[in-house]
């Protein structure tokens, strides 16, 4: 699999990466998540499943692995895999700023809580370091928004800069919501001693939600690494979705290229040269193997035009995402 630089971070990444939002905890908003886990939420068996997916990802050439403090036991599962499997020449990113509160309950009223305070950063960094050790290459603010306070919190900015200087770790932020572009624009203007604080950005971008494209390209041109999450829109761009009007055209294109709908969705993002790495969110080895076929898909202009025509109004996209059930 092709490797490239993650912007000017000095980190090498594969074009496809693996994210663990659906692996480290029993419930997530992906369509069919409960079926993927076969409704087996035993922690030891979930860790074994996670290791299988991570090993399959590595065998497929994936070299960027992404997790977060709020992904249940995601960091712990990945850390144990790193110790056991000892993969070579990989890069690891994690995130702080959300914490997991569901206590392994599927029907929990609240699954994660956002807190971008200095105290939360200090606590979660120690926890991330405990689980992942020296493997951490990129530490990201989880879901920065205009109202989360992170963009104006100079104490947190200074602490992030100190982490960068003391540990040699790159600093990033992930985005969510209809104002991704505005948040990124503000974040790019945050500097300490004349140096931009944030080295990389992780954003939602897919066939249905393209609103941040211009700013993501601008960030890439400015030297920031660009990581794309939710490329299959939490399962809406896979065969799990049989209801929405775009599904028929997506199915036909998948048949044309002899791959799954998921591979078409991922290929659309891989087609964007400003996207350094596109995360698979697979929770099974079979899904991962289907995702990897995206590397072989060559979309023509007709394909791209048809896919671009599927884009939704950003606010409508995020409204639909908010309505997805934890399962």
Provide a role label for each language-model segment.
Residues 21-23, 70, 95-99, 141-144, ...:
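Active-site beta-loop-alpha junctions enriched in small/polar residues
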Residues 91-118:
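Structural motif corresponding to the early beta-alpha repeats
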Residues 34-37, 41, 108-199, 207, ...:
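Glycine/proline-rich, positively charged
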